[in-house]
Amino acid sequence: MLVVKADYKKYPIPVLEKMRIDEDEFYKKYEACVVVQTCNRIEAYFDTEVNSNVDDILKDFQGFDILKGKNATFHFLKVSCGMDSMILGENQILGQIKTSFQKAREFKKTSRYLDSLFLKAIHVGQRARTETKINEGGVSIGSAAVELAEKNFGLTNRNVLLIGAGEIGTLVAKALVEKHIKAVIVANRTYERAETLAKELKGMAVHFDKLREAVNFSDVIICATSSPHYILEKEDLIDVGNKIIIDIANPRDVDDSVRELENIELYTIDDLRNISDKNLQRRIEEIPTVEKIIEEEYDVLMKQIEKINVEEVLKEFNTYIEEIRVKELEKAIKLSKSKDPEEIMENFSKAFAKRITHDFVSYSLNTSKEDLMNSAWWKNGK
């Protein structure tokens, strides 16, 4: 297997956005392949048994990191468990892998090997999340904000206002997706960005000049802009009813004097750091258990792949035998009118055996002893 990859560890998000693969064009060009793309990573997986043009692939993906064989497989299993994610153990990557795999199958671009790999990766990701706590507790400031709101106020059937649709706002949005919220409103100075994020949340976007109305409508307000000045001040919140406000912006979006209002509970980024740090430490402690699951499932996958390889060789071998049989039978039929049937059968069987022996000896002489002993044909022949 071959993997070409670019991710947040090497490139900033704006650069990754420019490196994104046009999936329709990708699937037109390559066989036996799957592309997995998220906001933080771009990866393409190739079955090299089908794609022998590895050099051409590498030319097409200059700037991408390259992984092959065992390293590529282990990498993908770690990705499925969220161990290679910006947020350790995050759940979203598993759904993205499933969606990517399904799209490749719709294009009829997978292979028996890639089918086995992706189904195994999905299974490993599920095991990691059910048998360990690698995905429990919010570890980003965004998810910690949502966790705090849920713990202190409850989010079921609440109206949530997210102010800010940048990087931090997006992290908040990811954490909100999994909650049973009545309504989500996204406000941002650039309305188009608010609209894009609101679609992901199945919510609604509002223009910034409608912020007052959105505040009145909301139960929970999460502020995550990059504004150099306050977005909400004391006079904005005097008669808006009971609200919980979580300000995770830096610099702050909410004037601290808001704490003087009895109807407002204000939390800042300092209140969240303890939550996220403790949760991250708990997730880190689960890494050895997840790695053990990956190693176990890798061994199972290799046995599945070996079986596939043997089946493919047997299929080719049967085709090869059948071709010889048909050719020798045609010769025998031509001779059947002029020779003794017993002699014809004798000659047919000898010619058949001689042809197989000749081809096997030729294969053996042109193959190293090590390769011969490791070949599925030899193992099966023994």
Curated annotation (Swiss-Prot):
Q: Does the keyword NADP apply?
A: yes
* Catalytic site positions: 39 (nucleophile)
Q: Which terms are listed as keywords in the entry?
A: NADP, Oxidoreductase, Porphyrin biosynthesis
Against CDD domains, the record matches this protein to: NAD_bind_Glutamyl_tRNA_reduct
- GO BP, one annotated term: protoporphyrinogen IX biosynthetic process from glutamate
Q: Mind telling me which residues the site (Important for activity) is annotated on?
A: 75
Q: Name one Pfam family in it.
A: GlutR_dimer
According to UniProt, this protein's pathway is: Porphyrin-containing compound metabolism; protoporphyrin-IX biosynthesis; 5-aminolevulinate from L-glutamyl-tRNA(Glu): step 1/2
Q: Where does substrate bind?
A: 38-41, 85, 90-92, 96
Which residues are listed for NADP(+) binding in this entry? 164-169
**Assembly state and interactors?**
Homodimer.
Q: What job does this protein perform?
A: Catalyzes the NADPH-dependent reduction of glutamyl-tRNA(Glu) to glutamate 1-semialdehyde (GSA).
In its miscellaneous comment, the UniProt entry states: During catalysis, the active site Cys acts as a nucleophile attacking the alpha-carbonyl group of tRNA-bound glutamate with the formation of a thioester intermediate between enzyme and glutamate, and the concomitant release of tRNA(Glu). The thioester intermediate is finally reduced by direct hydride transfer from NADPH, to form the product GSA.
Family classification: Belongs to the glutamyl-tRNA reductase family.
The record, for NCBIfam families, names: hemA (TIGR01035)
For domains, the record's comment is: Possesses an unusual extended V-shaped dimeric structure with each monomer consisting of three distinct domains arranged along a curved 'spinal' alpha-helix. The N-terminal catalytic domain specifically recognizes the glutamate moiety of the substrate. The second domain is the NADPH-binding domain, and the third C-terminal domain is responsible for dimerization.
Fetch the PANTHER family from UniProt. GLUTAMYL-TRNA REDUCTASE (PTHR43013:SF1)
What's the protein called, per UniProt? Answer: Glutamyl-tRNA reductase
Lineage of the species this protein comes from: Archaea, Methanobacteriati, Methanobacteriota, Methanomada group, Methanococci
